[in-house]
Amino acid sequence: MFCPILFCDNLVKLFDDEVELSVLRQTSIHNFSELHIEQFDKFDKVKGSLINCMVEKVGLYKTQFKDICFPPTLKFEPIKIKRYLPGGYFDWHVDVTGHTSMSRYLAFFIYLTDNEEGKTRFLNTAVDCKKGSMVIFPPMWPWVHRGEPPIETPKYIVGSYLHYNSPAWGAPNYMWSEYGRN
């Protein structure tokens, strides 16, 4: 477990308290609601803890690969919380699809709820949706993945990406979190 259970429960509550301000992403390939936590002051207290969860885990990669090719500074894309209602989904895709997302090099999902059906499925494996657990993977081909639909209860996840450099798509600098040169 990478994030404490009570911390996950608190994030779900914070999302639900602001759900009317969430953005519904509903197309033929996905159906979920999301919030960018940087847009809400009430998330300021938890943002640091979320980043710490991610930095701690990515530190294992950074230690192993720093002399080979790991970027010296961690630049996180703005953190989003997503809610998939029963039947919600994100069909097969990759998270680097062109110029606007090409600087992403690692994807992070932290599962905020337990959900037997709401797995993250890759072509040859699947990751269970277990509260407090995290999955990290490259966001480009061939790590094609999908968010399987929860059946009985909503699925909540936190997501972000590490970037090689400044955002190609023009997000304001205040929305970016930068950590260390260690």
Where are these regions (language model features)?
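Short, conserved beta-strand element in jelly-roll/cupin
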Residues: 81-85, 98-116, 161-164
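Acidic, glycine-rich loop-and-strand cores that form catalytic or ligand-binding grooves
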Residues: 71-85
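Histidine-centered catalytic micro-motifs
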Residues: 89-97
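Non-heme Fe(II)/2-oxoglutarate
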Residues: 1-73, 179
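Short beta-strand or tight-loop elements
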Residues: 77, 88-90, 104, 143
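A generic fold-level signal
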Residues: 6, 73-76, 100-103, 129, ...
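Catalytic core of Fe(II)/2-oxoglutarate
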Residues: 104, 115-182
